[in-house]
Amino acid sequence: MVVGVLKEVSPETRVSLIAEGVAQLTKKQIKVWVESGAGMNAFCSDEDYLAAGAEIKSSQEIADHADVVLSIHAPSISIRNGVVLIGMYQARFETERINNWNKQGAVVFSLELLPRTTRAQSMDILSSQANIAGYKAVLTAANAYGRYFPMFMTAAGSIAPAKVLILGAGVAGLQAIATAKRLGSVVEVFDTRPAVKEEVQSLGAKFIEIPGAADASAAGGYAVEQSDEYKKNQAQKIAESAAKADIIITTAQIPGKKAPILITEEVIKSMRRGSVIIDLAASTGGNTPLTKNRETVEQHGVKIIGDSNLPATMPSDASKLYGKNILNFLQLIINKEGKLILDTEDDLVKGARAQA
């Protein structure tokens, strides 16, 4: 069996499997073919892969012969009947592409579709990458914000700590809370799930409560549609907190749908000049109407940084974690003898498969 690792297209810097993960496959007599230069942006050279037991090949050779092809985003290779594709393909949005691959005979696993269960945690790419996104969102905000994060008391005077508002207490939000607190800021958090209140408070942040939320506990960390009355109360509470915030980090997304607007233009107008918004939902429309994906815009004196791919700014660690998720998933579909076995009754195999 041959497992192929493709090089991602710029601006993506991650790679789906780093050199240290190769040995786990080669010891099962699985050949690992890596596209030349695939790991360079993640600080993993072709020589590193060769030393780990991989072979360096072209993308065409991988397309023509690999039984399993690993990537992060959708590959641009020709699809062969029977090939297994594994990545993070945004299957809920890219339905046409997934349908085309299925028609060409590919078996497609898009790992963001994995059920959010205890058994799936070791292969949960959403969580491993969101953890990085939450951490880097705060550092990005601190870099863009022209003031201190912590309180300072000096002979020249006192500086008040930055006020950070985090919308969404999923994996990214919780890491953002922890990082913002470490930097000395005052943190407020909003989430539609009252169940996360204890987690938020344990990290030292204030939880903004809004009664009447629809139960989102089973949504795998995503937002769910709420009632009109709740949305009205939500908008009012968020507007009040946003007007006092120096930094806002938004993380709210709904599977298969456009991200909800949580910060209106009127709210942005009410914010202090020099404030910063980091929108992690930019790729699905953004949590503000002014967000532009992969761009920084300044409106009404507020910087709005739209970036849903912050893990790519930490390519080495992000690739290591992503690759570990991939290896754990491969254990479900490759047996100890290195043979491909697709157990269609396995809830994780069935859940991750992207089909028409």
Each PLM stretch: what is its role?
Residues 7-44, 150-241:
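Glycine-rich phosphate/diphosphate-binding loop of Rossmann-like nucleotide-binding domains
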Residues 73-74, 89-90, 253-255, 281-282:
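Short glycine-/small-residue-rich Rossmann-like dinucleotide-binding loops
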Residues 92-118, 257-310:
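Rossmann-fold NAD(P)-binding glycine/threonine-rich loop
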